[in-house]
């Protein structure tokens, strides 16, 4: 906790930005105002911290959030199924489609573009609005 506060204090007192690269969204939540989520070298979601955390608009962001341990340990971690793709041999379409429970034929052939969604955010998912509204089934 002390390190997070130190980083925030330095940002404010010096008027500087901070780029924090991490898979641990719990750490990011304590240090960031904006979040950029990347998968296979592409931005899949970006926006202000709270809206991204409260209603993620990409299935990979949902998966990352499910993998953040709760402080009380009451909820089990839910891993994202499958493995990340080989960066030199990405699948056609959305790179996340082999691991996504919401993937359709469209996802397998068409690369989704990063587009605006609610609350000043952007998502590279064909079904961003549905993900925000309905979530993603556990284990996906």
Predicted feature residues:
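Polar low-complexity intrinsically disordered regions
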Residues: 1-5, 137-140
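P-loop NTP-binding/switch modules centered on Walker-like glycine-rich loops
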Residues: 3-76
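Short catalytic/signature loops enriched in Gly
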Residues: 46-140
């Amino acid at each position: 906790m002390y390190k997070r506060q130190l980083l925030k204090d330095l940002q404010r007192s010096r008027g500087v930005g901070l780029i924090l690269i991490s898979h641990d969204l719990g750490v990011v939540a304590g240090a960031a105002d904006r979040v950029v989520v990347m998968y296979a070298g592409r931005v899949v979601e970006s926006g202000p911290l709270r809206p991204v955390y409260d209603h993620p608009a990409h299935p990979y962001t949902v998966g990352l959030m499910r993998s953040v341990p709760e402080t009380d340990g009451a909820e089990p971690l839910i891993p994202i199924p499958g493995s990340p793709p080989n960066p030199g041999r990405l699948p056609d379409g959305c790179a996340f489609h082999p691991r996504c429970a919401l993937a359709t034929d469209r996802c397998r052939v068409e690369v989704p573009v990063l587009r605006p969604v609610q609350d000043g955010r952007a998502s590279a998912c064909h079904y961003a609005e549905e993900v925000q509204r309905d979530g993603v089934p556990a284990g996906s």
